[in-house]
Design a protein with these regions (language model features):
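A late C-terminal transmembrane helix in Major Facilitator Superfamily
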Residues: 98-131
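Symmetry-related core transmembrane helices of the 12-TM Major Facilitator Superfamily/SLC fold
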Residues: 139-158
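Short amphipathic helix-loop junctions that connect adjacent transmembrane helices
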Residues: 1-11, 128
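Hydrophobic core of transmembrane alpha-helices in multi-pass small-molecule transporters
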Residues: 68-86
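Structural signature of the two symmetry-related core transmembrane helices
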Residues: 43-58
Length: 180
Protein backbone atom coordinates (compact mmCIF):
# COMPACT_ATOMS: atom_id res chain seq x y z
CA UNK A 1 0.00 0.00 0.00
CA UNK A 2 2.82 2.40 0.76
CA UNK A 3 5.19 1.33 -2.02
CA UNK A 4 2.90 0.64 -4.97
CA UNK A 5 -0.14 2.73 -4.08
CA UNK A 6 1.75 5.63 -2.51
CA UNK A 7 -0.28 5.73 0.69
CA UNK A 8 1.11 7.11 3.92
CA UNK A 9 1.87 4.66 6.70
CA UNK A 10 -1.07 5.97 8.72
CA UNK A 11 -3.52 5.56 5.82
CA UNK A 12 -2.21 2.05 5.13
CA UNK A 13 -2.63 1.27 8.82
CA UNK A 14 -6.19 2.57 8.73
CA UNK A 15 -6.91 0.22 5.82
CA UNK A 16 -5.64 -2.69 7.90
CA UNK A 17 -8.05 -1.64 10.64
CA UNK A 18 -10.84 -1.57 8.04
CA UNK A 19 -9.79 -5.09 7.06
CA UNK A 20 -10.17 -6.40 10.60
CA UNK A 21 -13.55 -4.70 11.05
CA UNK A 22 -14.77 -6.06 7.70
CA UNK A 23 -13.63 -9.57 8.60
CA UNK A 24 -15.42 -9.46 11.95
CA UNK A 25 -18.64 -8.05 10.48
CA UNK A 26 -18.64 -10.43 7.52
CA UNK A 27 -17.97 -13.38 9.81
CA UNK A 28 -21.17 -12.62 11.67
CA UNK A 29 -23.16 -12.16 8.46
CA UNK A 30 -21.73 -15.32 6.87
CA UNK A 31 -22.50 -17.30 10.01
CA UNK A 32 -26.12 -16.17 9.86
CA UNK A 33 -26.37 -16.89 6.13
CA UNK A 34 -24.83 -20.37 6.35
CA UNK A 35 -27.14 -21.23 9.22
CA UNK A 36 -30.21 -19.94 7.45
CA UNK A 37 -29.35 -21.24 3.95
CA UNK A 38 -27.16 -24.32 4.44
CA UNK A 39 -27.77 -25.57 0.91
CA UNK A 40 -26.39 -22.30 -0.49
CA UNK A 41 -23.00 -22.37 1.22
CA UNK A 42 -21.16 -23.22 -1.99
CA UNK A 43 -22.76 -20.19 -3.65
CA UNK A 44 -21.47 -18.02 -0.83
CA UNK A 45 -17.96 -19.39 -1.29
CA UNK A 46 -18.10 -18.95 -5.07
CA UNK A 47 -19.46 -15.41 -4.71
CA UNK A 48 -16.66 -14.47 -2.32
CA UNK A 49 -13.99 -15.82 -4.67
CA UNK A 50 -15.47 -14.12 -7.72
CA UNK A 51 -15.88 -10.82 -5.84
CA UNK A 52 -12.25 -10.95 -4.66
CA UNK A 53 -10.94 -11.78 -8.13
CA UNK A 54 -13.08 -9.05 -9.68
CA UNK A 55 -11.85 -6.41 -7.23
CA UNK A 56 -8.22 -7.38 -7.80
CA UNK A 57 -8.75 -7.35 -11.57
CA UNK A 58 -10.17 -3.82 -11.40
CA UNK A 59 -7.35 -2.51 -9.18
CA UNK A 60 -4.61 -4.23 -11.18
CA UNK A 61 -6.03 -3.03 -14.51
CA UNK A 62 -5.68 0.62 -13.54
CA UNK A 63 -2.77 2.45 -15.18
CA UNK A 64 -1.61 3.83 -11.84
CA UNK A 65 -2.43 3.85 -8.14
CA UNK A 66 -6.08 3.30 -7.27
CA UNK A 67 -8.19 5.98 -5.63
CA UNK A 68 -8.58 5.55 -1.88
CA UNK A 69 -12.28 4.68 -2.12
CA UNK A 70 -11.44 1.77 -4.44
CA UNK A 71 -8.71 0.54 -2.11
CA UNK A 72 -11.19 0.64 0.79
CA UNK A 73 -13.64 -1.40 -1.29
CA UNK A 74 -10.87 -3.86 -2.25
CA UNK A 75 -9.87 -4.29 1.39
CA UNK A 76 -13.47 -4.84 2.50
CA UNK A 77 -14.14 -7.40 -0.23
CA UNK A 78 -10.94 -9.41 0.25
CA UNK A 79 -11.41 -9.34 4.03
CA UNK A 80 -14.55 -11.42 3.61
CA UNK A 81 -12.31 -14.22 2.32
CA UNK A 82 -11.00 -15.12 5.78
CA UNK A 83 -14.40 -15.79 7.34
CA UNK A 84 -15.56 -17.19 4.01
CA UNK A 85 -12.88 -19.86 4.13
CA UNK A 86 -14.40 -21.19 7.35
CA UNK A 87 -17.41 -22.28 5.30
CA UNK A 88 -15.13 -25.01 3.93
CA UNK A 89 -14.87 -26.52 7.41
CA UNK A 90 -18.65 -26.42 7.73
CA UNK A 91 -19.07 -28.16 4.38
CA UNK A 92 -16.50 -30.81 5.30
CA UNK A 93 -18.27 -31.43 8.61
CA UNK A 94 -21.68 -31.67 7.00
CA UNK A 95 -20.94 -33.86 4.01
CA UNK A 96 -18.37 -36.36 5.29
CA UNK A 97 -18.96 -39.44 7.42
CA UNK A 98 -17.74 -39.08 10.99
CA UNK A 99 -15.02 -41.69 10.39
CA UNK A 100 -13.48 -39.41 7.73
CA UNK A 101 -14.17 -36.08 9.42
CA UNK A 102 -10.63 -35.53 10.71
CA UNK A 103 -9.16 -36.17 7.29
CA UNK A 104 -11.72 -33.92 5.61
CA UNK A 105 -11.11 -31.08 8.08
CA UNK A 106 -7.36 -31.52 7.68
CA UNK A 107 -7.64 -31.32 3.90
CA UNK A 108 -9.66 -28.11 4.13
CA UNK A 109 -7.17 -26.65 6.60
CA UNK A 110 -3.97 -27.57 4.81
CA UNK A 111 -5.43 -26.85 1.36
CA UNK A 112 -6.35 -23.28 2.23
CA UNK A 113 -3.16 -22.51 4.10
CA UNK A 114 -0.93 -24.17 1.52
CA UNK A 115 -2.55 -22.25 -1.33
CA UNK A 116 -2.17 -19.00 0.60
CA UNK A 117 1.47 -19.64 1.44
CA UNK A 118 2.31 -20.61 -2.13
CA UNK A 119 0.66 -17.45 -3.46
CA UNK A 120 2.53 -15.29 -0.93
CA UNK A 121 5.84 -16.97 -1.78
CA UNK A 122 5.22 -16.62 -5.52
CA UNK A 123 4.41 -12.93 -5.11
CA UNK A 124 7.68 -12.47 -3.22
CA UNK A 125 9.69 -14.36 -5.83
CA UNK A 126 8.19 -12.31 -8.64
CA UNK A 127 8.83 -9.04 -6.80
CA UNK A 128 12.46 -10.06 -6.23
CA UNK A 129 12.88 -11.15 -9.85
CA UNK A 130 11.46 -7.85 -11.08
CA UNK A 131 13.85 -5.91 -8.88
CA UNK A 132 11.73 -4.24 -6.28
CA UNK A 133 8.50 -2.84 -5.02
CA UNK A 134 7.32 -0.72 -7.92
CA UNK A 135 3.72 -0.35 -8.99
CA UNK A 136 4.38 -2.46 -12.09
CA UNK A 137 6.17 -5.18 -10.08
CA UNK A 138 3.23 -5.50 -7.72
CA UNK A 139 0.78 -5.54 -10.63
CA UNK A 140 2.58 -8.50 -12.22
CA UNK A 141 3.23 -10.32 -8.94
CA UNK A 142 -0.36 -10.10 -7.75
CA UNK A 143 -1.60 -11.76 -10.93
CA UNK A 144 -0.39 -15.07 -9.46
CA UNK A 145 -3.62 -15.20 -7.42
CA UNK A 146 -5.82 -15.72 -10.46
CA UNK A 147 -4.78 -19.29 -11.38
CA UNK A 148 -5.31 -20.28 -7.73
CA UNK A 149 -8.83 -18.86 -7.78
CA UNK A 150 -9.57 -20.73 -11.00
CA UNK A 151 -8.41 -24.02 -9.45
CA UNK A 152 -10.41 -23.28 -6.29
CA UNK A 153 -13.57 -22.46 -8.22
CA UNK A 154 -13.24 -25.65 -10.26
CA UNK A 155 -12.72 -27.59 -7.02
CA UNK A 156 -15.81 -26.11 -5.38
CA UNK A 157 -17.93 -26.80 -8.46
CA UNK A 158 -16.65 -30.39 -8.76
CA UNK A 159 -17.18 -31.25 -5.09
CA UNK A 160 -20.58 -29.58 -5.12
CA UNK A 161 -21.62 -31.75 -8.05
CA UNK A 162 -20.49 -34.91 -6.23
CA UNK A 163 -22.21 -33.82 -3.04
CA UNK A 164 -25.47 -33.15 -4.85
CA UNK A 165 -25.37 -36.65 -6.33
CA UNK A 166 -24.96 -38.12 -2.84
CA UNK A 167 -27.78 -35.94 -1.53
CA UNK A 168 -30.02 -36.96 -4.44
CA UNK A 169 -29.37 -40.62 -3.64
CA UNK A 170 -30.60 -39.86 -0.11
CA UNK A 171 -33.73 -38.18 -1.48
CA UNK A 172 -32.56 -34.61 -0.87
CA UNK A 173 -32.90 -32.33 -3.87
CA UNK A 174 -31.71 -28.76 -3.26
CA UNK A 175 -33.58 -26.15 -5.27
CA UNK A 176 -31.68 -24.54 -8.10
CA UNK A 177 -31.06 -20.80 -7.92
CA UNK A 178 -33.85 -20.31 -10.47
CA UNK A 179 -36.30 -22.12 -8.18
CA UNK A 180 -35.40 -20.08 -5.10
Amino acid sequence: LTSAQGLSASTAGALLTVSVAAAVASGIVLGLLTGRYPMRRSWLVLSIMVASATMWAIVLALPGPAPLWLLVLLVVVISVGGPGSVIGFDLARTFNPSANLGTAQGMVNIGGFLASLLVIAAIGWILDAMGGYTFESFRVALLVQFPVWIVAIIGVLATRRKTRKVLAADGIHPHTMREV
